Amino acid sequence: MSLGPTLDRRHLLSAGAGVAGSLASSAVAAASPVQKPRPAFHDLRDADTRLLEQVGRTGPLNLAKAYEVMQRNNLQGLVLGDPLNVFHVTGSWPFLGRTRPFYPPTTLAILTRDSKQAPGLVTSKFLYYYTFADGVPSGAQRQVFLYTDGPENPADFYPDRKEVPLDAVEIRRRDRVNEALAKNAPPVGIAPAVIAAMKAMGLWRSGRIGFDRFEIQEMCAHAEFPGQLVSGHVAMGEIRLIKSPLEIEMMRRAAVANIDAIHAAAAQIAPGATYRDLRSLFYAEASRRGNMPSMMTVDRVSNELADGVIRDGQALMVDIVSHFQSYHGDYGRTIAIGEPTAGVKRCIKASAVCWTAMSELIRPGVKFSELLAAGKAALKKSGIPTVVTVATHSVGLMHHDQPLFEQYGVSLPIDLVLEENMTLSLECVATNDTGIGGSVHYEDIMLITRDGAVPIHKVPDAVIQV
């Protein structure tokens, strides 16, 4: 880890965090026949298991909101190939969607307005066996439609050599595949499977169907679909806005780990450390807590090719994003290395004024534009001579997760109206004032309630003091 040219032993990252400390600890552990310590963050395990079992059983989707959006948009159903949408509807993330994000979809989700129909999952027999079956409990609330890549002998698919008893993974995969095959015989190829699934779910008829990948449109057109195919992007964006109780739990879990990670990382830096060091520490701490790091801006610098050296007396804004099973935490604070300058203190106060004004206005029925206007008006009224950028956006399966208005192939922002169970980031950034000795950021995620809003996580102080 590069700690900058001016760093000496007195400025090493805090005890236990440096490379030397880690190596020394490992050497002692290897030499001493003592019991290994309880793994870090072991206490999260049971709670995470409960959450993920529920995701596998029902999927995270807010079904009530989905039915309402489809009804309002006159959609009989949605046929979806974007991996994010497949996960949202079914709870299963397409494995190839991570490793080959721009390839044609091999797995699709189908959702119908008929509440008697469970969501559908269309995928290959091999992929279901190799990936999905491990996260799908028996009796999961979905219909599975498999397809093969060519003629096959079922006996050759997973032969039992009977040399040793089948292990838990082998039994689970065999059971899940057999359950699916007992309900729907697999055709050869994805297109026949999608068409068969649409027919089985009552969607192969006149009416409007939303889709999110052009391959779906081509499949249906080739088979002479009798209805109308329309873009489903806006509908899915509207559905994702309003979180189910399970999604709110996932958001809270992600947000808490995200915040704890940056506070743990900040405690390990000192003058002479670099921006890259801080970013690496945050990524490591987020991963230790079960989150996957997404991005981090340090002192206005988001380009990971750039770097800088942290100095005594500096204040640096951090904007951090990581996710737990695709549900995102988004948090911003100011890290002060020693005593901040008067200019930085002024910006911190101004950001807090804006954030407070916006948070006090939040309730169902308020528009995004009204929140922004409240923040700007509060800053003007305060008379504090500084520049604060105020922003708000929905957070969920993406860092900015909200519908965009599609017109002539161009996506345009919508002035959204707040609804109960939205998760909203309130963001106040003072980075345009230069020559003040640093940069300032104040950002938290709010959960919209029936008559107001509450933070989805604890709200630490505006400054992380180092």
What are the roles of these predicted feature ranges?
Residues 2-466:
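Active-site neighborhoods and metal-handling regions in enzymes and metal-associated proteins
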